[in-house]
């Protein structure tokens, strides 16, 4: 319903990096609503034990001027108590280093502590989370997963990333979930750890199987069935799974210190390596940017994955110019489709274009090469034809298939 309102311009949104939410630019916070699995009074203070996600709950509790309401949701098991590490970063000038050197190193408390007077009410509920089960893996996502695994192994062999300390971050969605599953199945990828914003079904399975040694996350995005399985088998995860506030799960300082390799999902990529990860056609929000910018800018290796086409081949995921840009070419190291890997490191703009066209769908490679050839007549470090940069998007809007593009309609001189 919220997504429909955003697409219809009935609701406005400011999409910001998740690690920047506490700067106060959104104005004063009047009330807070916090979901909890338990509340305990200890030595005159209330301890709020959270459920399957933390987000910005600690900051909301601290800044809410009139107080907070607690939604005590008994659907969530109190067995999850002890799986949270709640720590707030100090304000600048007094900010100490965030001393996390391992993915599940504990530096905070397993609860939020507030004064009883700050809690204005407790509402009892018994409601499961609304997350849906992930779509099953396809031939495309399995191929992307295998290419990603091969790319990681090659980087380890070259010494570009650490083989004995592989720490991954994974984006959200069925595609990212399937890629993580494929990495877990690869015999060449060593056991690894995860430091990420959101954990989905496949990483949870890999934790239980011992393939993932440790996982730190800001939230669990699991279907009610998978979340109930977690609660029923909590001992399989305890000591290997930790939930953190979003400003810690997405903290640039920690991402850089741990040498995280990020794996995020792209909606579209242009031939020079810019990535659109949020808006379909540049206008319709698919999802927020979340912490993907934090990870992409600070990761040791920043990779994006996507199928080469969408809508039964009528849309190419590789385009001359992105209709919206979330991640610039300066931070994107590699793109993976079912046709291979485009390693963009140490490449000029035109070398990046050749590498990306090589992993586009075969139907679109001649179209993209023709654009690059025509744009070459205009010269420059980066070759573009401003009147034709969005020709594929416009052709899909008018004709329903990017493959029907006619460059002559857009290039008049």
Please identify what each model-predicted range represents:
Residues 1-8, 12-13:
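Single conserved hydrophobic/aromatic residue that forms the stacking wall/gate
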Residues 53-67, 93-97, 187-201, 274-305, ...:
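Gly/Ser/Thr-rich active-site loops/lids in small-molecule metabolic enzymes
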Residues 193-196, 200, 205, 209, ...:
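A glycine- and small/hydrophobic-rich beta-loop-beta segment
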Residues 136-231:
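N-terminal active-site beta-alpha-beta segment that forms phosphate/nucleotide-binding
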Residues 120-135:
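Gly-rich Lys/Arg/Thr-decorated short loops/hinges at beta-loop-alpha junctions or inter-strand turns
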Residues 87, 329-413:
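Extended hydrophobic packing segments that form well-structured cores
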Residues 259-355, 363-364:
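C-terminal catalytic subdomain
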Residues 49-55, 70, 75-114:
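His/Asp/Glu-rich metal-coordinating catalytic cores
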């Amino acid at each position: 319903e919220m997504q429909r309102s955003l697409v219809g311009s009935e609701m406005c949104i400011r999409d910001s990096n998740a690690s920047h939410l506490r700067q106060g630019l959104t104005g004063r916070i009047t009330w807070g609503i916090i979901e909890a699995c338990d509340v305990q009074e200890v030595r005159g203070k209330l301890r709020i034990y959270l459920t399957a996600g933390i987000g910005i709950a600690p900051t909301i509790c601290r800044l809410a001027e009139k107080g907070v309401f607690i939604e005590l949701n008994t659907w969530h098991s109190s067995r999850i108590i002890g799986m949270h590490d709640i720590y707030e970063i100090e304000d600048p000038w007094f900010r100490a280093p965030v001393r996390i050197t391992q993915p599940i190193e504990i530096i905070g408390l397993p609860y939020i502590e507030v004064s009883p007077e700050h809690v204005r009410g407790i509402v009892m509920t018994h409601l499961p989370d609304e997350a849906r089960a992930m779509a099953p893996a396809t031939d495309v996502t399995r191929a992307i997963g295998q290419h990603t695994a091969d790319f990681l192994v090659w980087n380890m062999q070259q010494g570009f990333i650490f083989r004995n300390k592989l720490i991954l971050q994974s984006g959200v969605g069925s595609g990212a979930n399937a890629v993580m599953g494929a990495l877990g199945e690869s015999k060449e990828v060593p056991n690894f750890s995860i430091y990420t914003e959101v954990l989905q079904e496949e990483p949870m399975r890999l934790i239980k199987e011992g393939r993932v040694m440790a996982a730190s996350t800001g939230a669990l995005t699991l279907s009610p069935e998978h979340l109930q399985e977690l609660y029923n088998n909590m001992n399989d995860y305890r000591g290997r799974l930790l939930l953190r506030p979003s400003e810690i799960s997405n903290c640039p300082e920690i991402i850089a210190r741990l040498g995280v390799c990020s794996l995020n999902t792209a909606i579209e990529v242009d031939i020079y390596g810019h990535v659109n990860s949020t808006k379909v056609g540049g206008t319709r929000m698919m999802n927020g940017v979340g912490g993907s910018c934090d990870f992409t800018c600070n990761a040791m290796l920043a990779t994006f994955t996507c199928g080469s086409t969408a809508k039964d081949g009528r849309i190419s995921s590789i385009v001359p110019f992105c209709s919206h840009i979330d991640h610039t070419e300066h931070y994107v190291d590699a793109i993976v489709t079912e046709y291979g890997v485009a390693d963009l490191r140490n490449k000029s703009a035109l070398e990046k274009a050749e590498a990306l066209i090589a992993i586009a769908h075969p139907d679109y490679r001649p179209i993209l090469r023709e654009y690059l050839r025509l744009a070459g007549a205009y010269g420059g470090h980066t070759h573009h034809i401003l009147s034709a940069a969005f020709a594929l998007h416009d052709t899909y809007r008018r004709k329903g298939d990017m493959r029907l593009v006619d460059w002559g309609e857009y290039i008049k001189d």
